[in-house]
Amino acid sequence: QLLTPEIVFRLTQLHEYKGRLNRLLETDAAALSEIKETAALQTVAASNRMEGITVAEDRLKKLILNKTNPQTDDEKKVAGYRDVLTSISANYDFLPPAPSTILQLHRDLYKFSGKTVGGNYKDTAGEPCAESLASLCNAFEQALQDPVLDPLLLIPMFMVDFLNIAPFDNGTERMSRLLLALLLYRSGYEVGQYSSIDAILLNTKASYDAALQRSSHNWAAGTNDYAPFTAYLLNTLVTAYKSFDEIATRLTAKGLSKPDRVRDIIKLHQGEITKSEILKQCPDISQITVQRALADLLNNKHITKIGGGRYTSYIWNGEN
């Protein structure tokens, strides 16, 4: 029932993309490292926006880059998410998907809030959630030991179960996305470090909600269908890998002119991008060359300028 033609096709695609990313990391790791910061920025911003957590753009960027201290409740949530994502990216091999790990990550998610909500199950006694989460983690780990079972099928199922268990009063949805990153990285699918999966989830939130609802129907009775959410998540990963593939091709291309590289950076970037972010992605291109390329793109109406001064950003005009 789970192995529909669409899902089988997506699995094949993702296995191929995984191999390509691994090969590029072996040959062009330095070039690819330039886009990790941008992906992290997009991930933290998108995941928190999905939960209605709003922070002014200038403050958001400083918070994500750890260049200011959080002040409001929303800023503290952003800072907590930033730190947990950073920890997962750096230490995923040492973070098994166990209840103790999940509780620790949830505690860290709220470490700036000064509240006891972090690291505690939602019900007073804690037992029902604790038992359900322990059973889920044990079943997942056992399934991973079976070489016949593809982690890309197990991970969406884990997410559906986790979201239906809903072990926390606050932060369950954000934790689910952090756990998605953790499980993907541990399974060798590191695309989220170079292309923001959360940004794609945000842009397709209606489809996300619909797929999750369909796969959650009759969950308590144990007769739910995991296929809708599995197909959705695999499609999301394919989109992320395609975006990464385009960026990697551009970064490792030898024949493109510098203005064309600036153009492609903006075109392939999801959302707004600043001049400083462009410069970080292309350290061999001078600031003057980037400024000239931006002016030319503006004159030809390929991009739109947003804001001014230090916080000026640019976005690609979709019709071009």
Where are the regions a protein language model picked out?
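FIC/Doc superfamily catalytic core
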Residues: 1-320
